[in-house]
Amino acid sequence: MNKKIFNKSGIAIDFGATKISVSQIIKGKFKKTITEPTSINKIANNYIQQIEKNIKNLNISKSKKIGIAITGRVDQYGNWYPVNKENLGNFKIPLKKLIEKKFNTASTIINDATAAALGEANYGKGYQYKRLGYIT
């Protein structure tokens, strides 16, 4: 198992169609988490504001890294394309660029199911296997 990750600190965000969780991670441990319903207004900038509000509510002043696992498609440039158009709208949002500009820090944006599969394969029970299938 790759132990390097367990010394990492930053902000982890789980952004789904119905809920958003923002967590502060210090040396690989979840210290504080806020979870609330996702704002269902289909306006891209409001999602950024919701993330910002939750980070402020956790009293986090600065972080070297923000990681976001998000529902929908994410391209290689960090652009987000929601697939749940009923709740999230139908648009392309340059999420990586907006997050990095807003918080002046590096970010990683990845599809939530991909994040779960990679986490399980590299750090969970799947680590011991050569191949892994993952169903959400």
Label the model's feature ranges.
Residues N2-I5, G124-Q128, I135-T136:
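Solvent-exposed alpha-helices and their adjacent loops that cap or buttress functional pockets
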Residues S39-E52, K64-I66, V74-R131:
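Glycine-rich phosphate-binding loop and adjoining helix at the ATP-binding site
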Residues I5-N46, Y81-P82:
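Short glycine-rich, Thr/Ser-proximal phosphate-binding strand/loop in the N-terminal lobe
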Residues M1-S9, K56-N57, S61:
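Short, Lys/Arg-enriched, disordered terminal segments
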Residues K8-D14, K65-G67, R131-T136:
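Short glycine-aspartate micro-motif
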Residues I25, S63-I68:
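Short coil-to-beta-strand
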Residues T18, T71-V74:
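Short glycine-rich anion-binding loops that position phosphate/pyrophosphate groups of nucleotides
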